[in-house]
Amino acid sequence: MQDIEKNIKRIADYYKVKHQEKKLVEELGELLVEISKNMITNKVTENTASEIADVIILLTQIVYLYDIEQEVYDKFIYKIDREIKRILRRGNNNEKD
């Protein structure tokens, strides 16, 4: 796993923030297309996993380049905890907002 983290940082350092921001926007668009196809067809397209991987890789690079790892981690934990509390308040009711 450390090799992956090291390589993600190496790629980010090579391309720099502006390039990777543009690339992230492009990849988010491609993921949006795939998710839209999935919603229309009620099937997961072949490219979905690839597009998700692209977005995760680029988001990881942006978090590193912005130097906000701790802030993102803290928000990640906060938002998950908040949603679990919402679910628990609803009890067994599966209605979604």
Language-model-detected regions and their locations in the chain:
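Flexible "arm" and connector segments at domain edges
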Residues: 1-97
